[in-house]
């Protein structure tokens, strides 16, 4: 499975790229500059030299050629980036992972985008793409450390059944992670906003906690 990450040179994009490559996926780290994307890929390959990560850099446009595309650009630029690539993203699963947040004093607060959530704004920017939301609650530092096991549920939301299924399958390939169907994109507003709460807890507890849902019945039961 090939993964393309738009804005893959930032902390979240780099972290996800390394983690997905560590489980055998081929990952294209996209950037506005293909050279910068390759610099980041080289940095990660060198950092984890013993793991033979299949990482390469590219422009964002080339990253769109992957089977699944992840939008990891900063939240305020994500819709614009996706809109510029909308034709290339037609029919593809596009995972929005950014959170609209800003710092107020020592706290993080959620920004409510005009469309209600960043996921919805990304879907509007590429109306023929199959947009899902995922990976919002995984701390980048923990995700980036391949020697640190993960223990997290990942809430997945989408208006497209196929996108939900594909995204959950992707999440489930990461050891320690479990993809959970959280419903339609209307859930994204709450999912994204909760990240501010989680970051606040982690700051106060000096931790890198994610989330786990308890009491869930097995599917089909």
Where are these regions (language model features)?
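Rossmann-fold dehydrogenase core element
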Residues: 114-135
């Amino acid at each position: 499975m090939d993964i393309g990450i738009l804005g893959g040179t930032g902390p979240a994009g780099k972290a996800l790229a390394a983690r997905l490559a560590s489980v055998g996926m081929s990952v294209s780290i996209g950037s506005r500059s293909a050279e910068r994307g390759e610099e980041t890929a080289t940095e990660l390959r060198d950092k984890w030299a013993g793991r033979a990560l299949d990482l390469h850099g590219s422009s964002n446009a080339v990253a769109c050629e992957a089977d699944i595309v992840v939008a990891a650009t900063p939240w305020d630029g994500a819709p614009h980036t996706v809109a510029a690539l909308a034709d290339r993203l037609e029919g593809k699963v596009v995972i929005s992972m950014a959170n609209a947040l800003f710092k107020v004093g020592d706290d993080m607060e959620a920004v409510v985008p005009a469309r209600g959530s960043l996921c919805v704004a990304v879907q509007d920017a590429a109306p023929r793409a199959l947009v899902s939301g995922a990976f919002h609650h995984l701390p980048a530092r923990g995700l980036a450390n391949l020697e640190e096991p993960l223990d997290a549920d990942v809430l997945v939301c989408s208006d497209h059944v196929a996108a939900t299924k594909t995204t959950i399958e992707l999440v489930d390939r990461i050891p320690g992670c479990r993809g959970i169907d959280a419903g339609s994109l209307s859930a994204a507003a709450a999912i994204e906003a909760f990240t501010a709460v989680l970051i606040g807890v982690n700051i106060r507890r000096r931790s890198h906690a994610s989330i786990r849902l308890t009491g869930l019945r097995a599917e089909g039961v």
